[in-house]
Amino acid sequence: MDAARDGRPERRRAVSGTYRTHPFQRPSARRSAGRPARCGRRGRGAPRVRRPRPYFQRPPDEDTSEDENVYDYIDGDSSDSADDYDSDYFTANRGPNHGAGDAMDTDAPPERAPEGGAPQDYLTAHLRAIEVLPESAPHRSLLERTARTVYAQQFPPRDLSAGSKAPAQRARRSLRGFPRGGGGGQEPGPDDEGDDAADLREDLVPDEAYAHLERDERLSEGPPLLNMEAAAAAAGERSVVEELFTYAPAQPQVEVPLPRILEGRVRPSAFFAQMSLDALCRTPPNDQRVARERRAWEMAGTPHGLLITTWSTVDPEFSIGGMYVGAPEGTRPRLVWRRAMKQAMALQYRLGVGGLCRAVDGAACRPLRRCSFWRDALLRECATAIFCRGRGARAAPRRLPRPAVGLLAATQFTPPDASPHATLFRGSMGSLIYWHELRVMLTAVPALCARYAGAGLQSAELYLLALRHSEAPGYTANERYALSAYLTLFVALAERGLRWLYLAGAHLLGPHPTAAAFREVRAKIPYERLPLGSATLHDAEVETVDSATFQEALAFSALAHVYGEAYVAVRTATTLLMAEYAVHAERRDVRQMTAAFLGVGLIAQRLMGSLNLLLNCVAGAAVYGGRRVTVREGTLARYSLLADAALPLVRPVFLVEFREARDGVMRELRLRPVASPPLAGKRRVMELYLSLDSIEALVGREPLGSRPVLGPLVDIAEALADHPHLVTGDGRGPRLGGR
């Protein structure tokens, strides 16, 4: 009272229970920090549990009330829930015990309710929350992953060894998957019944079957991925940062139709839930991203040092007149005429991407149309890739059970789409990979891998066209041996790639995503230790690269070196994409899985087109040049079946047609084939820039098998006699794959 009379402020007693915390601390943390003090002053040992409101009470004839659970889950402490989900992007690399008390962060909800409370139906709560969330919500995948964990805990599969008293088996289905049996088809026959049952069993840890690869001392270093792994990781981090922090205005969205091969067989919502092609194709590509993708392609290094035109309606610069081929005479190896290289650029552009680019630009082709062809062609190829089996070829792996394949079940080769746009996209030597807007529709890592593989194949084809033409079709002895060796390796790589596309497509669309039949695409260890996860391809590389004749060809031939870099680029990019798919398949990230699947398909189309060009040049050296060329036994038979299986992606060109097309393009460009060296003033040479990404990095490994995987060397002229359709287009069987 004396202070009040004197005009000074009066100090009040601290009876309000006010507490001091950091001003940025969350409200829930401030309340929990002050609760013990308030409870102690009020004489209570614990806070009183708030009773639920009357209209959320459990009905007397029901065990639980879904409305109460949904209300408590969604509305309870909603101010903090969004922050928890957003922080998941920044705390993914923290310790295993970080956030152990939060069921949403650990994917392991409590098995029983808190003491004194009613049991919670967490599965229903998660499903209701997923229904109200939009597709673009950043934490939707987190909710789906947690719901799958809850489902697996509440409905465990039955142990077949426990007898009939074991609980009934209920297959784990994807939250957004097809209904059981959506693929249709008949049941497997009695001969395959046991194997099919083993393939359909649930396999939650697919890496256990490949644990021996980690202990194998012969694979201590794994496949040499060189600088691609770091570049892919950096590209993935940049894409995450762009999606989180870059303001992107809403783009106009269009309706994405079903692939034509699936029309009338499945609902669009069910299909796009399993393969999110709508998310990749619905939004038009951003102009800035397209410009960055074009700049990244143009700034990439090339072994010849020249700028490559990829997607343009203007021919590259070149000199008209005589086209002089052949290696320059001199002491230095790996030389080529600069004039012939620039002429080969124009020739390659006209034979490949030039016609496609001008047709697309003239018809104003929309991005949705190319996506429609691409997804339909990939699904058609997946349905026929398993039929790569025939006379003279190595036995193909066993087919997947029909219940596991689902919508991709087929009994014969699926014919390609015959529409005008599909015919256009299937031509041009499989050059869709050079379309910048198409690569932009993929995510960061698949776009990088597609660019890396496409650039390597493009540089190799330049040297292939610059060294020989119709007047001088024969290559040197070292070049012929190297080209035949790469022909065998590329065929083996393409076989593995098409096999993976078949498995990955069935895994995405099938009703049993965790079945043991999909172990090859879900396991991560094989792609960390083997090229494309294949021990057969590993042994084929060892047999080819360690040959003394092959090493001699590498020492003197620029063509052998540049094709080695192309092979390493394709195998590295494809292996990285397969590993990306396995990583995202573990948490069922459908968008990233679909992007990796499309990236492998894009590389496979370009690989089949480049393989067709390589075969025609090698066969032309024997048929028109009169040179002896040897290939591995069974290579042409395997390629013939691969060409039939990949027919929905790319149309192969036989030898006579290729020779006529090349001569016609040279006449249009006013190029005159000359078999002699160039005259004075035109004798400028170019030397191949050696790179670390060369096939020499594959030297010095040990084979995994005790028996050779490649057949003996045979004359390609005798092998072509058994496959006349590769030369003249005649002699095909009554149906695809029937030779």
From Swiss-Prot:
Residues 62-87 have a biased composition (Acidic residues). GO terms for biological process: regulation of DNA-templated transcription. GO terms for cellular component: host cell cytoplasm; host cell nucleus; viral tegument. A motif (Nuclear export signal) lies at residues 94-121, 483-493. Pfam families: Herpes_UL47 (PF03362). Monoubiquitinated. Phosphorylated by US3. This phosphorylation is required for proper nuclear localization. Interacts with US3 kinase. Interacts with UL31 and UL34; these interactions seem important for efficient virion nuclear egress. Interacts with UL41/VHS. Interacts with host DDB1. Belongs to the alphaherpesvirinae HHV-1 UL47 family. The nuclear export signal is CRM1-dependent. This is Tegument protein UL47. It comes from Bovine herpesvirus 1.1 (strain Cooper) (BoHV-1). The lineage of its organism: Viruses, Duplodnaviria, Heunggongvirae, Peploviricota, Herviviricetes.
